[in-house]
UniProtKB/Swiss-Prot annotation:
Lineage top rank: taxon: Archaea
Matching InterPro entries: ACT-like_dom_sf (IPR045865), ACT_dom (IPR002912), AHAS_small-like_ACT (IPR054480), CheY-like_superfamily (IPR011006), DUF5612 (IPR040537), UCP006363_ACT (IPR015832)
Pfam families xref list: ACT_AHAS_ss, DUF5612
Gene3D superfamilies, per database record: 3.30.70.260, Hypothetical protein af1403, domain 2 (3.40.50.10550)
Domain ACT per the UniProt entry, residue ranges: 4-83
Protein name (record): Uncharacterized protein MJ1458
Length: 218
């Protein structure tokens, strides 16, 4: 069983080592972690997803007995709460339309028990888009990327190629000028339809298989 753990602890040397040591001693394997320091600089927030912990009560006792721990909570993992993610990047107007289609379709599947979330980044400029696409590889739980705009090519195309090679994340592109549509898995003319298809491509309760339409323009 995989669980989510949220910890607020003192921001000082050795704290993270101590906390992960407790998890290791209890047979826990950390599958995902994220940390950041709060604005005051004195407290750090640590989120971890852990599998293999059999004695939850002992975990609570060990964590709460640490002087460096200010708060500790066990909950469902983000994978279970938010599920797979549709990432939509590009020009604001096109991103909004794709998101509208994706959210409507995600609602249908989430009602049936799935968990699909939709993330958007309205952004323009080749360098900005290049960095955004490359960064998708570092995001957790990404199921598919949709690129929405009227012109994308150059470094953005290289970033798409690299993303697909490294992660295998499928990419849908709106019909646009530039070379990005040539390297996308699917090109869609209607932004609303692109959003719907993006969700269907990663939904377990849908029968759409993006691999069967690779390279097509809809």
């Amino acid at each position: 069983m995989e669980i989510g753990i949220s910890i607020e602890a003192e921001n000082k040397v050795g704290v993270l080592h101590k906390l992960t040591g407790i998890l290791s001693e209890l047979g826990g394997n950390i599958t995902y972690t994220q940390q950041f320091i709060k604005d005051d600089g004195k407290i750090g927030f640590i989120y971890m997803e852990v599998e293999g912990i059999k004695d939850i009560e002992e975990l609570k006792r060990r964590m709460e007995s640490c002087e460096c721990v200010k708060s500790f909570e066990i909950h469902s993992s983000l994978k279970k709460i938010y599920g797979k993610r549709v990432i939509i990047i590009g020009g604001g107007a096109q991103v909004a339309e794709v998101a509208r289609g994706a959210i409507s379709e995600a609602d249908r599947h989430n009602i049936r028990g799935e968990r699909i979330s939709v993330d958007t980044l309205p952004i323009v400029g080749e360098e900005n888009l290049y960095e955004a696409v490359k960064a998708v590889a570092t995001l957790p739980r990404v199921g598919i990327l949709v690129l929405a705009g009227s012109l994308m090519g150059g470094k953005i195309t290289e970033a798409v190629k690299e993303l697909k090679e490294k992660t295998g994340i499928p990419v849908i592109s709106l019909k646009m000028f530039g070379s990005v549509p040539k390297v996308a898995d699917l090109v869609v003319g209607d932004p609303l339809q692109a959003g719907v298809l993006a969700v269907m491509a990663i939904a377990e309760t849908a029968k759409f298989d993006i691999n069967k339409v690779k390279g097509r323009v809809l």
